Amino acid sequence: MERHSLNTSVKMPVSASLACKNYDYDYDSIQPYFYFDNDDEDFYHHQQGQTQPSAPSEDIWKKFELLPTPPLSPSRRQSLSTAEQLEMVSEFLGDDVVSQSFICDDADYSQSFIKSIIIQDCMWSGFSAAAKLEKVVSERLASLHAERKELMSDSNSNRLNASYLQDLSTSASECIDPSVVFPYPLTECGKAGKVASPQPMLVLDTPPNSSSSSGSDSEDEEEEDEEEEEEEEEEEEEEEEEEIDVVTVEKRQKRHETDASESRYPSPLVLKRCHVSTHQHNYAAHPSTRHDQPAVKRLRLEASNNHSINSSSSNRHVKQRKCASPRTSDSEDNDKRRTHNVLERQRRNELKLSFFALRDEIPEVANNEKAAKVVILKKATECIHSMQLDEQRLLSIKEQLRRKSEQLKHRLQQLRSSH
């Protein structure tokens, strides 16, 4: 079964047959564990025709180590030939199946490689079989020394680099550096998530033999310091942004609370009814009382008008005292409307009194207390026209009498002068 590697480069091909895998850094390369290819747990591709080995599963961490992890830094080791790959895989797996896990098409990362045999995964921070791992590593290193001697004998087919095997022998003394596990800087990650804590140091018994480890360690420490500083700056920026968001939310909540308080406790509206007495004509009353009604109605109307005006003015003063809210415009409109209604009632009452007085002056409808306004107006018009005609007739008679009197005076004067 072909496994996806955790250290795949960005520039490497994606296909399963040509996937570049750091098999020498995977713990499974030293002590492999496999699963059956079930439908529920088909996490990895497998080669057709390959038999599935048995799955020893006592340790719970053996299941988690097969899960995929975030991509890591590209491999810096030299690319191996197909013959070397076959020999290495047959040594580790004890199987005749050709594994293409060491094929790497990119030559930019073939100058050096990471010198750690432990898998570059944060899951190894909780691995409980450290002693067992050290034992297996020491045994496999011895087998690698023997294999190196066999491979160096055949220079045509085997071109395994001596520094590669030496670095394998010295890799047990090195610990995993956080910059190796998390090779990409935080600014290029798109702020997808915060970097986990670095793995604990696992020191093995094999002493170091290469002098290049000190330089790489110092570079790794510098990279680690830079990453920590960038991480702190990003955390501060995120905290500032969060604080700004909280302030805006609080402001909105305050506004919402003020709106809710205004809606729950609106400003009290002082609404007082103005008692305006509307006096209607008593059509059922006796005709003898028609002359006394206008004066009484006028007195009552004046008293009611004074009372309504006083009440409206008092309501206006009370409203101005109590209403100190944004709804003062509405209250003023209500006061104006109320005053207008009072004045309109007063006008109607005066109009009724005028009709009643006019009806009493017309002889034809003077005794008809149920006469309509239109009838009163028509009869009043006819009465006016008749009065005008009578006036003209009387004026003409007066003029005739004046002339006749003048003639009589002139004749009397002549008679006196004759004597």
Curated annotation (Swiss-Prot):
GO cellular component labels: nucleus
Keywords recorded for this protein, A-Z: Activator, DNA-binding, Glycoprotein, Nucleus, Proto-oncogene, Transcription, Transcription regulation
Biased amino acid composition, Basic and acidic residues: 248-262
Biased composition (Low complexity): 305-315
Domain bHLH as annotated: residue spans: 335-387
GO biological process: hematopoietic stem cell differentiation; positive regulation of cell population proliferation; regulation of transcription by RNA polymerase II; regulation of vasculature development; vasculature development
Glycosylation site positions: T69
Molecular function, one GO term: protein dimerization activity
Subcellular location, record wording: Nucleus
Assembly information from the UniProt record: Efficient DNA binding requires dimerization with another bHLH protein. Binds DNA as a heterodimer with max.
Record function comment: Transcription factor that binds DNA in a non-specific manner, yet also specifically recognizes the core sequence 5'-CAC[GA]TG-3'. Activates the transcription of growth-related genes.
Protein name: Transcriptional regulator Myc-A
Source organism phylogeny: Eukaryota, Metazoa, Chordata, Craniata, Vertebrata
Gene (UniProt): myca
